[in-house]
Amino acid sequence: MMNSNLVPFDPYYKKRITYVWRGQQFAFDVAHTIFSSFQIDEGTDLLLRLIEPAFSEPQRILDVGCGCGVIGICLARRFPQADVTLVDKDLLAVRYARHNAELNATTNVTVLGSVGLSEAPPGPYDLIVSNIPAKIGDYAIEHEFILEPLRHLRPGGEYWFVVVSGLNHLIPRLGPRHNLRLKEIKKRAGHSVYRIIAPAATMPTGGL
């Protein structure tokens, strides 16, 4: 576990980014090769400013593809009663997300290395979030970042995610294709935020 005083000596360390969300100050140390290492990604910021889950006090939250941990750590601060799990396939991202959880005193965060959700604790989760990577291909996005997370939601749970506008050719088609309760929450230059609500009874399985 990295100590905040030692981070500048880490060979991958790039800089510390400050971020204000819901009136609270956060700090995130980032590495050279981690996604969005210059500033908080605009899609991440848009998602965080829009997310309002129906469960006012979610007990279990999952951040898929967490990067350095911005979304999950912010939600852990907002919902201190929740058990928040962050997963990423990049072990350097995992290392920095763990450090940033400590840096921001979010003791309710667990960070795990995981390809997709293979190592994530089993659901159900009340809330799942993701800034979906754009360059992994339509099939992987559909199956690994849309349908698979839905398997881990509790009935009535919510999946909030943001995508770059280049994926708007794909995401809206997935609603009718898999009978999903999919809604576009907001479109802003470069990004769109969506929400899927899991059915009250059976999880979607079409196409798997």
Regions found by a protein language model. Name each.
Residues H143-P155:
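A short glycine-rich, Lys/Arg-flanked "PGG" loop and its adjoining helix->strand segment in the class I
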Residues V64-C68, Y125-G137, P149:
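Conserved proline-anchored active-site loop of SAM-dependent methyltransferases
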Residues G43-P121, S130:
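Conserved SAM/SAH cofactor-binding pocket of Class I
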Residues V164-H178:
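Conserved class I S-adenosyl-L-methionine
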Residues K187-L208:
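Core SAM-dependent methyltransferase catalytic element
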Residues V30-Q39:
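Class I SAM-dependent methyltransferase Rossmann-like catalytic core
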Residues M1-W21, S36:
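N-terminal auxiliary segments of SAM/dcSAM-dependent transferases
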Residues G156-V163:
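Conserved beta-strand signature within the Rossmann-like core of class I S-adenosyl-L-methionine
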